[in-house]
Amino acid sequence: RPCVEQMYFYNDDDGRSSFINFINTFKNQAAWSIEDRKSFVRVYSNTGAHVEIFANKPETEQNGISSIEAYLNERKLSPSVIIHRGHSFHTESTLEKIPSSAKLIFVGSCGGFYKISMALENAPEAHIISTKQVGTKTINDAMLLALNENIRTGKDIVWNDFWDKMREKLRDNQYFND
């Protein structure tokens, strides 16, 4: 079974900009392909472990989210990774949709940390990655690519090692420790 991820984008300046950055992060990676499905995209691994990332297009917001849910239901798939992208005022809209199947929840919005209890209501055993203060696409996408490369290549995610690598990679970004 694939590692299925669902990423939520919202139709505002930050959501559109973050979506473009997400696509650009994966489009030049030989191990990944992007399939346009009109209201959403499917980013999937070409080699290694089978990883599928479903992301609604911000402009199609709810229609894209519904289309992803229908696509997953049709194939009897449930996301094990949930990713919120965009402004904090959309965070609750994402977190209320978290399925019990979620093993990892990534909240990349400003102050995402303050809504974590809501995420854990539906998936109490999930691991959480969240911003404390400022969320930024340059950090979110670098971390998401690194996480997905670990999954794709079958590496165990050892959190201390992962954070050490991220600190090294993002040390010049003023928001990393935020």
Predicted regions and their residues:
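Catalytic cores of nucleophile-dependent amide-cleaving enzymes
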Residues: L77-G154
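Structural alpha-beta junctions
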Residues: I23-D36, N122-I129, T153-K155
